[in-house]
Curated annotation (Swiss-Prot):
UniProtKB keywords: ATP-binding, Ligase, Nucleotide-binding, Protein biosynthesis
Top EC class of this enzyme: ligase
PROSITE patterns: AMIDASES (PS00571)
E.C. designation(s): 6.3.5.7
UniProt family annotation: Belongs to the amidase family. GatA subfamily.
Record flagged with keyword Protein biosynthesis: yes
Active site: 77, 152, 176
The protein, known as: Glutamyl-tRNA(Gln) amidotransferase subunit A
Subunit structure: Heterotrimer of A, B and C subunits.
Organism field: Streptococcus pyogenes serotype M4 (strain MGAS10750)
GO cellular component terms, A-Z: glutamyl-tRNA(Gln) amidotransferase complex
């Protein structure tokens, strides 16, 4: 018997009633992972021994009836540090790296007696939108194994969508939670910048990165955010603001809520069927009592260019630490210190990572800094101001998560510009540090379509309120791929 169809609350009730034990739930989860892993390739590492040991310890002390997450398995993206469990960032550079500490988000999960079941596949150093740049394997879409799962948190999304786990953690720098959530028909939230500590997250773009949750439903997503969100003295960008319970508004109606629909989000480059799906969702929100009106975010069209200058510049700085000296991969054909650096980085990094390091180094170089990095920062401010103007009059922004449904494996991985453009709807949210969620909103050609809801900073509870209201009157979240036992 598999438990992957049961919600976290249902699993908690079973655990409290001792109808199942944490060990039994962990064993069943491991079976679900193994039976589906060959088809989707969600995991880099499955920490079976450690997970069963932790489950046994939880059983020995007893399930806490007041702790919803006690004994619940959790998958963690492989750029989030886990003490004693390989954390590779899907790179040859860190193929053998075992951290000696836990990321704060993981420590928070352990504090709630969650069980880390394994580390999920991703694009190398979170640089990519298809989970095809991983050094280890290519993850496949849960709905169609010839399609990409999205990225960079592709493994975390497919692990949930395929029924391997109920909950997972990802990271989002330019859409890396929301895009794979959309492609796989699950719920993925990028929290407000600073809501979840970045301590222990292997850095890509430090002003953009944010850890967030994946789940099959809106409420379960909010329940996981309750666990991982916290202020943290170890992260200088950690926000002091902390919502007591992100589920507090779930179930409330949205009558009177004002929702903005940017015309730029339905313009050139958006698949017509995606546009139709979003417009249908807008009508659904209106039927629920919200007002939906067209607005403009005029500088959003510059988001991709701005992002790839800023993110690559920050990456070129952050990735300087990987040099073959302290830990991780080291080239064995070097004859001196310079060759250690050059050969290690040439052999240890994949093509996409090297491309972004070169772009970032160029953007920061003397003579080009003002024309590229400084200018990108100025346009980033204009993008933020666009959002501020809209949120002066509206509660939320509505739009598609992605311009298309999942594309084929090996179709865009040799065309970096086309791959970058796939993030044009998610990137502005990171540039502005805002919260954004992707929820299932329909299907095109049998593949899931994601609907994105964006709010002002620290309004995750309002986003969850609107998302849950939409979820309650639709059944897209209930439809499952064949690998999960569905009929799609």
């Amino acid at each position: 018997m598999s438990f992957n169809h049961k919600t976290i609350e249902e699993l908690h009730d079973l655990l409290v009633a001792k109808e199942i034990s944490a060990t039994e739930l962990t064993q069943k989860t491991l079976e679900d992972i193994k039976s589906r892993e060959e088809a989707v390739g969600s995991f880099i590492t499955v920490s079976e021994e450690a997970a069963l040991k932790q489950a046994a310890a939880i059983d020995a002390k007893g399930i806490d009836a007041d702790n919803l997450m006690s004994g619940i398995p959790l998958a963690v993206k492989d750029n989030i540090s886990t003490k004693g469990i390989l954390t590779t960032a899907a790179s040859k550079m860190l193929y053998n790296y075992e951290p000696i500490f836990d990321a704060t988000s993981v420590a928070n999960a352990y504090a709630k007696d969650m069980i880390v079941i394994g580390k999920t596949n991703m694009d190398e150093f979170a640089m990519g939108g298809s989970t095809e740049t991983s050094y280890f394997k290519k993850t496949k879409n849960a709905w169609d194994h010839t399609k990409v799962p999205g990225g960079s948190s592709g493994g975390s999304a497919t692990a949930v969508a395929s029924g391997q786990v109920r909950l997972s953690l990802g990271s989002d720098t330019g859409g890396s939670i929301r895009q794979p959530a959309a492609f796989n028909g699950v719920v993925g939230l990028k929290p407000t910048y600073g809501t979840v500590s970045r301590y222990g997250l292997i850095a890509f773009g430090s002003s953009l990165d944010q850890i967030g949750p994946f789940a099959p439903t809106v409420k379960e997503n909010a329940q996981l955010l309750n666990v991982i969100a916290s202020s943290d003295v170890k992260d200088a960008t950690s926000a002091p603001v902390r919502i007591a319970d992100y589920t507090s508004k779930i179930g409330r109606d949205i009558k009177g809520m004002k929702i903005a629909l940017p015309k730029e989000y339905l313009g050139e480059g958006i698949d017509p069927e995606i546009k139709e799906t979003v417009l249908a969702a807008a009508k659904q929100f209106e039927a629920l009592g919200a007002t939906v009106e067209e607005v403009s975010l005029p500088h959003s069209k510059y988001g991709v260019a701005v992002y790839y200058i800023i993110a690559s510049s920050e990456a070129s700085s952050n990735l300087q630490r990987f040099d073959g000296i302290r830990y991780g991969f080291r080239a064995d054909d070097a004859k001196n210190l310079d060759e250690i650096y050059v050969n290690t980085r040439s052999q240890g990094f994949g093509d996409e990572v090297k491309r972004r390091i070169m772009l970032g180094t160029f953007s920061l170089s003397s003579g080009y800094y003002d024309a590229y990095f400084k200018k990108a920062g100025q346009v980033r401010t204009l993008i933020i101001e666009d959002f501020d103007k809209v949120f002066a009059d509206y509660d939320l922004i509505l739009g598609p998560t992605t311009p298309t449904v999942a594309f084929g494996l090996d179709t865009l991985n040799h065309d970096p510009v086309a791959m970058y453009l796939a993030d044009l709807l998610t990137i502005p949210v990171n540039l502005a540090g805002l919260p954004g969620i992707s929820i299932p909103a329909g299907f095109v050609d049998g593949l899931p379509v994601g609907l994105q809801l964006i709010g002002p900073k620290y309004t995750e509870e309002t986003i969850y309120q609107a998302a849950a209201a939409f979820e309650a009157v639709t059944d897209y979240h209930k439809q499952q791929p064949i690998i999960f036992g569905g009929d799609k």
